Design a protein with these regions (language model features):
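Short polar/acidic secondary-structure junctions
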Residues: 157, 714-716
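ATP-dependent phospho-/nucleotidyl transfer catalytic cores
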Residues: 492
Length: 761
């Protein structure tokens, strides 16, 4: 679907309606951001992104909650609350995840309405809208709601959502604040709302149970909302009972209805401070971040903050689509992990313990199984503080719960996905010289979990680990997903070995490095695939490499119980830590190359297909690195060819511009890194040298150094690399270390329309 607003000019276009949208200066980088990218596409394989307002890595993600008429939102169409194919808005809630397959949160929905309403009206207050009167960019969102003649505008700080509603009707203008709102499929408890008409304020709280938060007892939040306009009258509701003038209400369905009277030609602004610690903290967050500021001031500050973040990578290209895709991808990579620390340093930790973050910002919503592959490696270059915050937060979570979490969401462990991906994140951070954390403590948590065999232990984060340690693989009899689990454990063991070595624990390093070779135990030399294996050492039959599996999705396609979210073909390449060992298993390097190229050719012809097939699937994580394996096989030219194909074919400028769920910026960061010509070997301190799609780039490394990338003769046809130099010296192999890049310098690619001998190396 083509977007109406493309944001190629300096100003956001005006929306006609009750009040003209102010001309908003977007600045040099935010003007290229299009938050609608990844909000549409086919159900379930959408990017699952939202177009609303947020600050970089902020707590508040203020965005419309949409649906079809009658509130229909089937098939996980909009897990972040918004789906581009919907045509009604139910209101604007303040919390959500970004790009995940899980519907989560949706705290404190605000909905503008007009005229008189019954309780039944409140439950069906959907507002039609069209995309030709909707616009968004980094830090700002607006939509015209014709049924109530209202222009809704949103912006945000780290902990505060700021709204402005401009009405062009003589009907009473009203604002509903639902204290117990949640996104689709959730529920709420412990709701409370209180109105203070003297100070134009509403406060409240609720515990929300949704996709992830419902797995650990719900996430209780608090809000203080302050208006700039007095109420003409007000009511509160408890379920279907609406009581005029009642100041306080309680229950699992409660909120406030605020009547401002005739606001024709006028606007009402409100600021909503959020905290997950206390009501007092919500108020302190509100006052600290927005005291004395109106909507325009907050919006301008949000846009400026985004421009500062986006300017950390300056690119040059004459292709406007590339610039749009690049800066939107960089924007989407800077939404999670979430700032969970209030302005006074307090945060709600695991088991609802209130902690204090000293010397760092406690962050949550870490989609580690995904983000360790691309997003966090990007942070080690341009967002070092965010990377260290993430590590320190994981250690704090482990201290509270007994183990490093797998997928922390809000104030608890969601348990989503599998393995111990925090091992990769922590090891890579330390190996790249970011050592300002308690590495010994982190290592002990990593080691304990890797050796834990008691399923009842808090450290039991590896399913079937007892069998893994006993057999050197996970027998099929132990349970489902045995192949995928074993491959991930081997990768994670290798990262533990690298950290052990860096810490001088050489016996441990040798042990885990040897165990990281366990992937070989499930490789069938006859079929040349990783397969489920029985306790007696025989491979399970029948076997087909083309069957695709989904266990945690609502639309199962096929069942092949040894694999997670993919086919045996897609898991065939999952030996990120030992690509040469993988190639040796194939027995012949040329055979490996031909199989890998056929795998790429068998990708679905269309981006974001509902059935990804068994070939290359850029919309999921386990084969994201596959195109770079051509480099390990001695064919950098094929890597260069297929990198350009992924960059141009699997990304676009429309609402369907991603090949699947973005998962906390994972697909977005893949684009950012590959577009400038490098790709991380996750869990290590090394990068592949790829082939850039931009003419040049400057990366601000945050340590006083600048990494410059230049692509000489860059064009749509010149996709191959004939030579690469770093600081004037020709590179003789297509790899580079983090230490070299992080010291700054210039990486120069000479591009060519034809493959070079040895891929330019």
């Amino acid at each position: 679907t083509a977007l109406i607003f493309l944001f190629m000019s300096v100003f956001v276009p005006n929306i006609t309606g009750p009040a003209q949208m102010p001309e908003v200066e977007m600045g040099e980088y935010a003007r290229y951001v299009d938050p609608f990218i990844g909000t549409g596409g086919l159900p379930w394989v959408s990017g699952m992104l939202f177009p609303g307002a947020t600050a970089p890595f902020g707590l508040v993600r203020l965005s419309p909650d949409t649906a079809f008429p009658a509130g229909l939102n089937p098939f996980k169409m909009g897990t972040a609350g918004y789906y581009y194919g919907h045509n009604t808005i139910w209101g604007f809630s303040h919390t959500r995840l970004s790009g995940t397959g899980a519907v989560d949160m949706g705290h404190f929905r605000v909905t503008p309405v007009t005229g008189k309403m019954s309780a039944a009206d409140r439950l069906s207050s959907s507002l039609p809208f069209s995309h030709d009167k909707e616009t968004a960019t980094a830090g700002y969102y607006a939509v015209y709601l014709p049924s109530i003649s209202c222009l809704a505008e949103l912006t945000a700080t780290q902990h505060v959502g700021v709204h402005r509603y401009s009405f062009d009707t003589s009907k009473d203008a009203r604002i509903l604040i639902d204290a117990t709102s949640f996104l689709a499929g959730g529920r709420a408890e412990e709701g409370r709302v209180k109105v203070n008409p003297e100070t134009y304020e509403v406060e409240g709280e609720a515990r929300v149970f949704t996709g992830f938060t419902g797995r650990y007892g719900g996430l209780k939040g608090y809000f203080v909302a302050k208006f700039d306009t007095p109420f003409k009258s007000f009511a509160t509701w408890e379920g279907s009972a609406v009581t005029e003038g009642k100041i306080e209400a309680f229950g699992n369905d409660t909120g406030a209805d605020l009547n401002f009277g005739n606001l024709k030609g006028k606007s009402v602004e409100l600021k909503v401070g959020i905290s997950f610690v206390s009501l007092e903290n919500a108020r302190e967050n509100l006052e600290f971040e927005t005291e004395g500021k109106n909507f325009d001031t907050v919006r301008d500050e949000a846009v400026a903050e985004w421009n500062a973040g986006l300017s950390k990578i300056k690119i040059d290209t004459n292709d406007k689509d590339i610039k749009k895709i690049f800066y939107t991808a960089l924007y989407h990579s800077m939404i999670m992990p979430t700032n969970f620390t209030d302005v006074n340093g307090q945060y709600l930790g695991f088991n609802e313990k209130v902690g204090v973050a000293e010397g760092y910002t406690y962050r949550t919503d870490l989609s580690l199984w995904d983000t360790v592959r691309t997003t966090h490696p990007l942070y080690t270059l341009i967002e070092k503080e965010i990377q260290l915050d993430s590590v320190k937060s994981l250690i704090a979570m482990a201290e509270e719960s007994g183990a490093l979490p797998r997928w922390p969401s809000g104030a608890g462990e969601s348990g989503s996905m599998f393995g111990t991906p925090a091992d990769l994140l922590i090891a890579e951070t330390y190996l790249k010289g970011l050592t300002d954390f308690d590495a010994e403590k982190a290592y002990n948590f990593m080691k304990n979990t890797a050796l834990e065999t008691d399923d009842d232990s808090p450290a039991a984060k590896r399913d079937y680990n007892k069998e893994y340690l006993q057999y050197g693989y996970i027998p099929a009899q132990a349970g489902k997903r045995s192949v995928s689990y074993a491959l991930e454990y081997a990768w994670e063991d290798y990262s533990i070995a690298l950290l052990a070595e860096a810490l001088g624990k050489f016996e441990d390093a040798e042990f885990f490095k040897e165990r990281s070779k366990s992937y070989k135990n499930i490789f069938n030399p006859e079929t040349k695939y990783f397969q489920a294996k029985s306790k007696n050492g025989t491979f399970v039959e029948p076997f087909s490499p083309y069957i695709t599996t989904y266990y945690d999705e609502v639309l199962p396609i096929k069942v092949s119980s040894a694999y997670v979210e993919g086919s045996p073909r897609q898991w065939r390449w999952s030996v990120q830590h030992d690509p040469q060992g993988l190639i040796e298993l194939f027995g012949d390097r040329d055979y490996f190359i031909s199989e890998l190229e056929q795998f790429m050719k068998d990708a679905t012809p269309k981006r974001a297909a509902i059935d990804p097939g068994s070939g290359y699937w850029h919309g999921n994580q386990h084969d994201l690195h596959a195109v770079y394996l051509f480099i390990d096989a001695g064919r950098p030219d094929l890597a260069q060819k297929w990198i350009r194909w992924v960059l141009t074919d699997r990304y676009g400028t429309g609402a369907d511009g991603l090949d699947g769920n973005d998962d906390g910026g994972t697909l977005s960061a893949w684009y950012v890194l590959s577009a400038v010509g490098i790709y991380p070997m996750a869990g290590t301190d090394k990068y592949y040298i790829g082939a850039p799609i931009v003419d040049s780039a400057e990366l601000d490394l945050g340590n006083g150094n600048i990494l410059k990338v230049r692509a000489v003769n860059q064009s749509k046809d010149n996709i191959y690399v004939s030579e690469v130099t770093f600081n004037g010296e020709k590179l003789t192999e297509p790899y580079i270390t983090h230490a070299l890049l992080d010291a700054g310098g210039e990486l120069v690619f000479t591009m060519s329309p034809t493959p070079a001998e040895n891929g330019g190396f």
